[in-house]
Structures are given as structure tokens and as C-alpha cells.
Amino acid sequence: MAQTDRRATGDGLLEKLVGVRRVAKVVKGGRQFGFSALTVVGDGKGRVGFGRGKAREVPVAIQKAMENARKNMISVPLEGDTLQHPITARHGAAKVHMQPASEGTGIIAGGAMRAVFEVVGVHNVLAKCIGSANPVNVVQATVKGLVQMSSPEAIAAKRGKNLEEIVGGG
């Protein structure tokens, strides 16, 4: 589950630590221990990125993960403070289903998905993780789903039609 480390940095980005794991490398003389960190970074207005960092010490691993997350930021078209439409995405064995929710619903999502929604600026969403609950795969599937989401205006422009033809101006 994501830790509640929601820090606003000097550049206006929200950082969230999803998890830290201790990993071991077996060598001739025994085991060498290190740490792996997974973080998500966002501006709360539709930009999000995730990163992984590995190091011998926890703070260094977290710092590397934050830097990677800042480098890999993408923009997400939001509908106010929720999603444009329901979407399902998968990465590996992790499958996530996300759908928009009405005002006042809140973020109904588990651990790693919740962290992504909090930093991207989504305040009302219903989400479910199906299959693997591995935080790395869940975060990647969530971000993949957010990237696939597009606004009705973008779909209309892509198809060369007007908005009423797409949404059924009815």
C-alpha cells in the first residue's frame, strides 16, 4: 500500500512513495542487500509519472525513483476531477478497471492505484485491480489506462467529425 508521504516540492509537483522493497544479490561471500523503491509524481492537474530506483540505501533508492518519475511524466485529459470514460488496461498479469464517478464519491481504489490518482488530480473515481496486485505492474497498468483515455473532442478531431456526431447530440 502507498505510504502517505504526499510532499509538495519546490517545482509544484506532488510526490508519493508507493513502496520500498529489500532485495538480495547472492554472491560467493554471501548475500548483498539493496533496496528498490517505486514512486509516483504528479502536478495534481493531469500530469503524472512513475519511477523505480535501486540502491544500497533506502534514501538513495527513493531519490533515484523520484528523478526517474520526473523524467517520465505524461499528460492525461481529465474531465474536471474525474475520468473521461470507463477504461480497462493491463500490464503483465495486473488488470485494472477504472470508471468516472460523480462528485463526492472520492477515490475508491486500492493501494498503488490510489497513489496514482492522488498525484494526477483525480478526486472522484471507482477503480478495481483484477489479477496480480504487484504494485509495479498495477502502477504501470493504471498509467497505461490513463494514457489510452481521450476526450470526446480529441476523438471527433481524429475522425474528422463534429462533437455532436460523436456523443450523439440528443
From Swiss-Prot:
| Record-level Gene Ontology MF annotations | rRNA binding; structural constituent of ribosome
One GO BP on record is: translation
List the disulfide bonds in this chain: none
All copies of the S5 DRBM domain together span: 13-76
Membrane-crossing residue ranges in chain numbering: none
Signal peptide span: none
Q: Which domain of life is it from?
A: Bacteria
Q: Record keywords: Lipid metabolism included?
A: no
One cellular component term from this protein's GO annotations in UniProt? small ribosomal subunit
Q: Does the keyword Ribonucleoprotein apply?
A: yes
What keywords does the record list, in alphabetical order? Answer: Ribonucleoprotein, Ribosomal protein, RNA-binding, rRNA-binding
Entry function:
With S4 and S12 plays an important role in translational accuracy.
Q: Which family does it belong to?
A: Belongs to the universal ribosomal protein uS5 family.
The domain-related comment in the record is:
The N-terminal domain interacts with the head of the 30S subunit; the C-terminal domain interacts with the body and contacts protein S4. The interaction surface between S4 and S5 is involved in control of translational fidelity.
Subunit record text: Part of the 30S ribosomal subunit. Contacts proteins S4 and S8.
This protein is called Small ribosomal subunit protein uS5
